[in-house]
UniProtKB/Swiss-Prot annotation:
It comes from Bos taurus (Bovine). The keyword Nucleus applies. Residues 137-147 have a biased composition (Polar residues). This is Spermatogenesis-associated protein 46. Plays a role in spermiogenesis and fertilization. InterPro entries: Spt46-like. Residues 125-164 are annotated as: Disordered. GO terms for cellular component: nuclear membrane. It comes from the Eukaryota. GO terms for biological process: cell differentiation; fertilization; fusion of sperm to egg plasma membrane involved in single fertilization; spermatogenesis. The gene is SPATA46. The keyword Membrane applies. Keywords: Differentiation, Membrane, Nucleus, Spermatogenesis. It is found in: Nucleus membrane. Coiled coil: none annotated.
Length: 247
């Protein structure tokens, strides 16, 4: 190694005899040192993409979910007993992920995988959860009686006070009984704003949250208290004295 210490940019000039010995030293060092110029490649592992079965017809794309429906099934080689292995293959890509996932299951196995029917069912449930105003307009615009609104069916099957889910004109008038009578409009019992018609007051209650008002929550709470009081005293109706406690 002392021979290499003579190699310096600012040092003295090396004689030609010393330089002639350097190739021999380098060659001997090169034979003894490990071969680092050639990186050792890891054993090639077949990636999932390379191990994919042959493409089968029937690809479906819907909202980022690739579903390959095999007709009848993808055939992946032969089994040791001579029977052909059949697999149900699905490519699944979540909407929040840039990667796709390849799912395969044997036809005879009972392992559950992500199927396209579940995606359609989830999307159907997501589409059925429309806003209240949109659902009301869709239900009111359906001409045939067969097209029943799923929201109304949910309300009817929901246990408890189904009438407290929506605010009606009767509820608005009942809440206004404990306020001074207005000569030229209807007053909101929550924010005390005055509206010319009863329909405009109801629209304010339903859509007031877009403007920062919580009147809809107030009327819902008020109606829930009315229901609890009617349930506690089923023979009595709400009177003026009992309603003044909600002011």
């Amino acid at each position: 190694m002392e021979n290499f210490s003579l190699l310096s940019i600012s040092g003295t000039r090396i004689s030609s005899s010393a330089l002639s010995t350097l190739p021999d030293i380098m060659s001997s060092r090169a034979t003894s040192l490990p071969d680092i110029a050639k990186p050792v490649l890891p054993t090639e592992v077949p990636s999932p993409v390379q191990a994919l079965p042959p493409q089968c017809p029937g690809g479906v794309l819907r909202h980022g979910v690739h579903n390959i429906v095999i007709s009848p099934d993808c055939i992946l080689g032969d089994a040791p007993n001579g029977e052909q292995l059949r697999w149900n293959c699905t490519i699944y890509r979540p909407w929040f992920s840039p990667y796709s996932y390849f799912l395969c299951k044997d036809k005879e196995s009972h392992l559950e995988t992500y199927s396209f029917s579940e995606v359609q069912r989830d999307e159907g449930q997501r589409d059925s959860c429309l806003p209240e105003d949109t659902a009301d307009s869709v239900c009111s615009s359906s001409p045939s009686p067969e097209n029943t609104c799923p929201r109304e069916a949910t309300k009817k099957s929901r246990p408890g006070p189904d009438t407290t889910d929506s605010i009606t004109f009767q509820d608005i008038l009942m809440a206004s009984k404990w306020h001074p009578a207005q000569q030229n409009g209807y007053k909101c019992a929550s924010c005390c704003r005055l509206y010319p018609t009863l329909h405009s007051l109801k629209s304010h209650i339903k859509r007031g949250f877009k403007e920062g008002f919580s009147c809809k929550v107030y009327y819902h709470k008020l109606k829930t208290l009315w229901y609890k009081e009617q349930k506690a005293r089923p023979g009595d109706r709400l009177s003026l004295g009992s309603g003044q406690a909600f002011r």
